Amino acid sequence: MFWVILRLEGVIMKTIGLIGGMSWESTITYYQVLNETIKQVLGGLHSAKCILYSVDFEEIEKCQANGDWNRSAEILSDAAQSLEKAGADYIVICTNTMHKVADEIERHIHIPLLHIAEMTAVELEKSGITKVGLLGTKYTMQQDFYKCILENRGIHVVIPNEDQVELVNDII
């Protein structure tokens, strides 16, 4: 998994700070895949060193619906600062949409925030993939915070038409 960072000098695992709760279902997936990957890489009973900060998704969703991305950034920046103070070596946001405020979060912390679009671009490049379909919430599909990162790395991004965007958003 792209966010598993191991330094192989005897194997020292880094502590991952997870900003989750958007939704708790997606957070479970991150936690599960992270631990399955650690077990696969290290074997035995190894599990990931991680710290989870779960935000109240109701508050985040209201901010999204009202276009109050500044308040969302404040909430997630507070979460990121808490994770940093708790000892996280880097941070992952356990959802695509909230990467819209990743730049603002980064301004409030002194540890790396791994941007999912950057990590996705790296994996696509490794696989030789140059064209992808982007599905997600309407914010992820219609705004540039994800798409531009891929396009700036030479990856053509295909997005559904407006009716399809609404359908996909409703399903999510």
Name every feature range the model reports, one short phrase each:
Residues 9-172:
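Non-catalytic structural scaffold of enzyme domains
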